[in-house]
Amino acid sequence: MSATGAKLDRTAAYPWYDSWWLAKYFEAQAIIERVKPAALPDFIRALAPLRTDTSFRTTMLDQPFDAATLDAIRSVVKNLRPTELELHEARAFGRFVVHDHPMFVELQRRAIPIVSEVVGEPVEASYSFLSLYSTRGVCAVHLDAPQAKWTFDLCVDQNAPWPIHFSDVRPWPDRDELTGYASGRDDWQERIKKSPSLKFSELRPRVGEAIVFSGSSQWHYRDPIDPAAGAAFCTLLFMHFIPRGTADLLDPRHWAALVGVPELAALQRQS
């Protein structure tokens, strides 16, 4: 849900933030098809654990943590120093973020068995971040990079429910599919939101509830916070998980050795 660097990562072909990984994946496929076509099935098969089974359904968890834990999270939020707040998403998302706070790292460790049971596969922690949305809060429609294959989205505090919308689980979109949405137009986000084939549904999490979803295979978005809510706010804790043992697959720099295609070494991991 959030790039860990100081910029929002997108490409011309994949115009949403956090799209860099998918662009690298299809670039790698094109290279393999050109220089060693016989290796393409092996490449696709090797990275298959990062995909999401289409039978998965978004899951709402009622109070996965007790009141004392929620109070402890709020205490951390209340006592954050201004220097701890990352500002690079303030304009685009109307939020401040804090990545991998020690308390949240421990909380994420505790959540591993919960998420593993919900998603039906063993997982390990990827990264986490606290998201402090203000009256300008918004989250444009996007897919996450597979570093966030699974997301545990905990509503820590809010002044009113803020809807979030999810598509069904989808195969990763290739350039041809995206051309159907974008086609050089600036309304590609609305075209995705209104696509009947994506079957968007809406959830309105309450304080203490959490949503488990597959951000890398489900389009998702939040419309701007309703200005009628006044001094609106929403504090969310995102904890991202990956299938256990797949960390190396996430780094394009490892793909050359993975399938014996030296030309893939030119691919660089996003910084």
Residue map of PLM features:
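Non-heme Fe(II)/2-oxoglutarate
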Residues: 5-119
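Glycine- and charge-enriched low-complexity intrinsically disordered segments
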Residues: 251-271
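Short beta-strand His + acidic residue motifs that chelate non-heme Fe in jelly-roll/DSBH
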Residues: 139-142, 219-230
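Catalytic core of non-heme Fe(II) oxygenases with the double-stranded beta-helix
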Residues: 135-216, 246-253
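A short coil-to-beta-strand element that immediately follows conserved catalytic motifs
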Residues: 119-130
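A short hydrophobic beta-strand segment most commonly corresponding to one strand
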Residues: 151, 228-247
